[in-house]
Structures are given as structure tokens and as C-alpha cells.
């Protein structure tokens, strides 16, 4: 069963075509990794999934991108889409407020005022991000006092507090040390039990470790997608073979 179905998707920045006839199913409650060299289109595609590219002037998109069978570029509420499809960015970006308020912020923005409800969601979200035990005694402390890895897990907690269906991750560990990276990767294994995860990564080793499916992009084209084990052990396209072998990057 697929969470997203992408069919003949083209994206232009003005006259420059950044994505070329992309056809890609993204299965539900699995980790799909998007890999390829810089500028290949993987982050551009990721941002199509919650319409973040709408914020860029001159963008034109054609083709079909459906979530649960509904065209997300049709007549839908984009704010609701971005709640259902949360996003975690490359650099941890906690809000300049307490740990507690970082997670509670989105709930308050939705009009939820009941303290007990907010307390429960904050704890559940921090537990879901494997952060609760590390911060439960300092929830009122400023989020900037956390380590980089903790800040990134706080951003994940902030995302899952909104009860999304999908979590997009754009190189979520590239700014983290190996220990923090390992914790995020362990967390993703747990998160996929409840969420569909799509991750952009420059690390082929990471894609191999954490993903169920992998899609390889090159110069705006989707070269190949398959089970991750197949992509890395028996790719069908010579360009994929060259990339996973490290012949270019």
C-alpha cells in the first residue's frame, strides 16, 4: 500500500527543469531514502510532498502527486497538508523558547488550551522522540541548552505532536556527531511503525542502514528505485552502480 503515488511529475524553476517525469510510489509506514549527488533533485522532490516549493517564486509543477489517493496539488488546504506531512530539516531549528513550549507551540496554535491535554501530548511526543528521559526534569529550560542531537530529537517531537501521517527528513543527521546520528537512526526504526518516513541523505551507508526502499536521482531524473538491498547489491542501471560504488558523487 502506498502513501504517495507520484506520476509524470515535472518541476521547473523558471526555465530550468529540476525534476523530469518522476514516477515513484512511496509505501506506507516504511523508510524511503532519496539519494544522489548534490543538485540531483532529491530535496526538491522531498519538498513537493508537502508543497514547500510553493514558497519559491517562479515554480511550476505538472503531473500528479497523490497522498492516500488525493491529488495534493488540487483544491486542498495546504496548511492542513503540512500538518499531515511534517518536516525535519538539516540543521536543528528549535524555537527560542523552553523545551516544553517547543512541543506545545503547535498545539496552542491550533487553539488547544487545556493544560492537562498539552502536558500529555508533550510527554507522549518527547517519549516518541526518545528524549523524555533526558529532559523530563528540565522541561522549562531553554531549548538552546540542548546538544545538537537533542535539539534534532526535540524538532522530531515537535513534529509528531501534531499527529502527522508522514515525516519528511532532509539530511537530518548531517550536522550531528556519530553518536547523535546513531540515536536518530534508532529512532527512525521506531517511528516507521506509526509514520511514513521519507529521508534525503548524502550518506549511502545511512541509506543502506535505515531505509526499506531507496530511490536514486541524477540530474533531475529518477534513475532507479527498488528495495534498498537490491539498489546496493544488484542495481539494474549502470549509473546507479557507479554511484553506490563511489565512482562519482
Swiss-Prot record:
CDD domains assigned to the protein according to its UniProt record, in alphabetical order: ABC_PstB_phosphate_transporter
Top-level EC class as recorded in UniProt = translocase
Q: Which GO terms describe its cellular component?
A: plasma membrane
> According to the UniProt entry, what is the EC number of this protein?
7.3.2.1
Question: What does it catalyze?
Answer: phosphate(out) + ATP + H2O = ADP + 2 phosphate(in) + H(+)
Annotated ATP binding sites: 36-43
Outline the extent of the ABC transporter domain: 4-244
The places in or outside the cell where this protein is found are: Cell inner membrane
Q: How does it sit in the membrane?
A: Peripheral membrane protein
Q: Which Pfam families match?
A: ABC_tran (PF00005)
Record carries keyword Transferase = no
Q: Which UniProt keywords apply?
A: ATP-binding, Cell inner membrane, Cell membrane, Membrane, Nucleotide-binding, Phosphate transport, Translocase, Transport
Gene Ontology molecular functions: ATP binding; ATP hydrolysis activity; ATPase-coupled phosphate ion transmembrane transporter activity
Question: Which Gene Ontology biological process is one annotated for this entry?
Answer: phosphate ion transmembrane transport
Key word Transmembrane present: no
SS bond list:
none
> The organism sits in which domain of life?
Bacteria
Assembly mode: The complex is composed of two ATP-binding proteins (PstB), two transmembrane proteins (PstC and PstA) and a solute-binding protein (PstS).
Primary role: Part of the ABC transporter complex PstSACB involved in phosphate import. Responsible for energy coupling to the transport system.
NCBIfam families hit by this protein: 3a0107s01c2 (TIGR00972)
Name assigned to this protein: Phosphate import ATP-binding protein PstB 2
Q: What is the lineage of its organism?
A: Bacteria, Pseudomonadati, Pseudomonadota, Gammaproteobacteria, Vibrionales
Amino acid at each position: 500500500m502506498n502513501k504517495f503515488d507520484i506520476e509524470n511529475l515535472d518541476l521547473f524553476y523558471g526555465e530550468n527543469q529540476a525534476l523530469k517525469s518522476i514516477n515513484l510510489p512511496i509505501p506506507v509506514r516504511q523508510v524511503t531514502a532519496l539519494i544522489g549527488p548534490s543538485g540531483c533533485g532529491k530535496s526538491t522532490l522531498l519538498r513537493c510532498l508537502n508543497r514547500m516549493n510553493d514558497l519559491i517564486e517562479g515554480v511550476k509543477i505538472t503531473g500528479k502527486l497523490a497522498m492516500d489517493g488525493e491529488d495534493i496539488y488540487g483544491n486542498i488546504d495546504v496548511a492542513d497538508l503540512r500538518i499531515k506531512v511534517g518536516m525535519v530539516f538539516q540543521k536543528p531549528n528549535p524555537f527560542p523558547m523552553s523545551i516544553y513550549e517547543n512541543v506545545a507551540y503547535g498545539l496552542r496554535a491550533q487553539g488547544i488550551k487545556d493544560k492537562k491535554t498539552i502536558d500529555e501530548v508533550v510527554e507522549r511526543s518527547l517519549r516518541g522522540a526518545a528524549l523524555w528521559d533526558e529532559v523530563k526534569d528540565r522541561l522549562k529550560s531553554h531549548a538552546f541548552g540542548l546538544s545538537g542531537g537533542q535539539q534534532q530529537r526535540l524538532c522530531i517531537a515537535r513534529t509528531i505532536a501534531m499527529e502527522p501521517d508522514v515525516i519528511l527528513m532532509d539530511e537530518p543527521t548531517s550536522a550531528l556527531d556519530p553518536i547523535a546520528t546513531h540515536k536518530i537512526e534508532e529512532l527512525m526504526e521506531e517511528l516507521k511503525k506509526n509514520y511514513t518516513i521519507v529521508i534525503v541523505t548524502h550518506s549511502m551507508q545511512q541509506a543502506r542502514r535505515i531505509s526499506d526502499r531507496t530511490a536514486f536521482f541524477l540530474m533531475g531524473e529518477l534513475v532507479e528505485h527498488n528495495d534498498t538491498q537490491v539498489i546496493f547489491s544488484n542495481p539494474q542501471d549502470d549509473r546507479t552502480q557507479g554511484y553506490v560504488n563511489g565512482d562519482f558523487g
